[in-house]
C-alpha cells in the first residue's frame, strides 16, 4: 500500500516595516479572533484592540509582535478521509503608542 505523498504548500513573503516574515499557505481556515483570545488567556494579558491601532496609518504607526502562540491544526484529505496533524504559529501584532515630549 502506497503512502500519500506529502506536498509542500507555497510560501509567500510579507514585509512589515523592514521585517520580513515567511508565511506557509495552507488550505486550513482558522478563526483569528479565537486565536487572539487564546493568546490573551495563555499570556495573562489582553492586547489593545482600539480603532486607532487597527486602522492606524502605516507611516505613523510601528507594529511590533505582542504575543506568539502555537495551535494544533488538522488538514483533512477528502479523497482518502484522513487527517494530517499540523502546527501553526500565530503572531499577534499591536501598534506602538507615540509619546510626545
UniProtKB/Swiss-Prot annotation:
Q: Where is the composition biased (Polar residues)?
A: 50-60
Region named Disordered: 39-74
Tell me where on the tree of life, at the top rank, the source sits. Eukaryota
Q: What is this protein called?
A: Putative uncharacterized protein LINC02906
Native source organism of the sequence: Homo sapiens
Taxonomy of origin reads: Eukaryota, Metazoa, Chordata, Craniata, Vertebrata
